[in-house]
Amino acid sequence: MKLELDMFFLYGSTILPECILIFSLLIILIIDLTFPKKDTIWLYFISLTSLLISIIILLFQYKTDPIISFLGSFQTDSFNRIFQSFIVFCSILCIPLSIEYIKCAKMAIPEFLIFILTATVGGMFLCGANDLVTIFVSLECLSLCSYLLCGYTKRDIRSNEAAIKYLLIGGTSSSILAYGFSWLYGLSGGETNIQKITNGLLNAETYNSSGTFIAFICILVGLAFKLSLVPFHQWTPDIYEGSPTPVVAFLSVTSKIAGLALATRILNILFSFSPNEWKIFLEILAILSMILGNLVAITQTSMKRMLAYSSISQIGYILIGLITGDLKGYTSMTIYVFFYIFMNLGTFACIILYSLRTGTDNIRDYAGLYIKDPLLSFSLTLCLLSLGGLPPLTGFFGKLYLFWCGWQSGFYLLVFIALITSVISLYYYLKIIKLILTKKNNEINPYIQAYIITSPTFFSKNPIEFVMIFCVLGSTFLGIIINPIFSFFQDSLSLSVFFIK
């Protein structure tokens, strides 16, 4: 009996952060059904409190030894704890970004928070999924909530179109991924646990068969769709442009973090017997993403479409760390993902704030913004320059470590293209900054002329401005303490299943 209780508490502790979020979304659902006239402040309070408790628990658990629980379907180690913390952290920042937007768009608040929390839970389970069934169910939990969030502004035709496109593309990619899983299930003798599948393929000597190659291609294509890698990226700009901007901010980071954690686990465990092969394919996808993402971003007139192509190029940079395959490469990848959260969400906070005050996201309508709102102009400038990797901002140090690890591992062409495309990205970022900062009074557009600042002080009560300032500070000053951050993540990742011998 004592052994059973110990196992219960051990297994329960591995999914305690997820259980807290599930409990909170059930409370929100009950409140929504029970009280017709409810105070929305309490709903936000419950959501944010549960997320804060979850991330505190994750931070206490990040250095625990790897634990396989629930009959091998879930694995807890330092790698997935870090990525789960990133997902929860993104949700904490994205909920304040949505408060004013939801109020202006007259959207239902309880359902929105339920979808955000459910997507967060799905992403967290996906980071530690150790079984094909668990992977697929977690992925669909995240995906289905993403589709619903994209179409949440039901009165907006563009939002409905984005939701339908995302549903069709997402369903197709999930089907391709499931087809690849079915090949592995058959070739391994009916196993669903990813370690047992690898052992089954090695024991049956089918790891070099055409069936395994088909499974690998299908899984890689499915993952490439989820990560918006070229040439499987076509859906991304349309979804970014049509969906509510806070939803885009949420999906632009959480879906990539969860997808990256899944790709790392699958490629390092399922296909550990052929690392050179999958690295070649990933290198090609990363190069295409960096080149096409940055070149097409130059031609965009919408801020959200520009950020869509920018995110495509950013995931290309992040893949450099995964391709290197060693501890330093994974550490640099993790650091850049952490920095990317601040840079990307800071940029989206600026866009949300500007679109709420003007109703536009066209790049040319930002002309002369510095005259009316210096704080917003300064914040957007710093976030864009950090995304471009301009020293001495945070993005520069993230890219520096990433490129250096790739160069040390011998991926010279990959790093060279990354450097060239980073310079190209500075062009379209600086083009926007020039537009914001250099227009004269007689050239100001009508949107800026009618622009009204609701809270011009630095210490703002506006939650969007609070998140914006927080992310700007992270995008600007985190690079100063890059060495302690690198040591922290390196020590943590050294305890993950990928590096424990």
UniProtKB/Swiss-Prot annotation:
It is a multi-pass membrane protein. One of its GO terms (cellular component) is chloroplast thylakoid membrane. One of its GO terms (biological process) is photosynthesis, light reaction. The keyword Cytoplasm does not apply. It catalyses: a plastoquinone + NADH + (n+1) H(+)(in) = a plastoquinol + NAD(+) + n H(+)(out); a plastoquinone + NADPH + (n+1) H(+)(in) = a plastoquinol + NADP(+) + n H(+)(out). Its EC number is 7.1.1.-. GO terms for molecular function: NADH dehydrogenase (ubiquinone) activity; quinone binding. It comes from the Eukaryota. Keywords: Chloroplast, Membrane, NAD, NADP, Plastid, Plastoquinone, Quinone, Thylakoid, Translocase, Transmembrane, Transmembrane helix, Transport. Its main location: plastid. It is found in: Plastid, Chloroplast thylakoid membrane. Pfam families: Ndh2_N, Proton_antipo_M. The chain crosses the membrane at residues 15-35, 40-60, 82-102, 107-127, 132-152, 167-187, 212-232, 244-264, 278-298, 307-327, 333-353, 378-398, 410-430, 466-486. NDH shuttles electrons from NAD(P)H:plastoquinone, via FMN and iron-sulfur (Fe-S) centers, to quinones in the photosynthetic chain and possibly in a chloroplast respiratory chain. The immediate electron acceptor for the enzyme in this species is believed to be plastoquinone. Couples the redox reaction to proton translocation, and thus conserves the redox energy in a proton gradient. NDH is composed of at least 16 different subunits, 5 of which are encoded in the nucleus. Belongs to the complex I subunit 2 family. This is NAD(P)H-quinone oxidoreductase subunit 2, chloroplastic. It comes from Marchantia polymorpha. The lineage of its organism: Eukaryota, Viridiplantae, Streptophyta, Embryophyta, Marchantiophyta. The gene is ndhB.
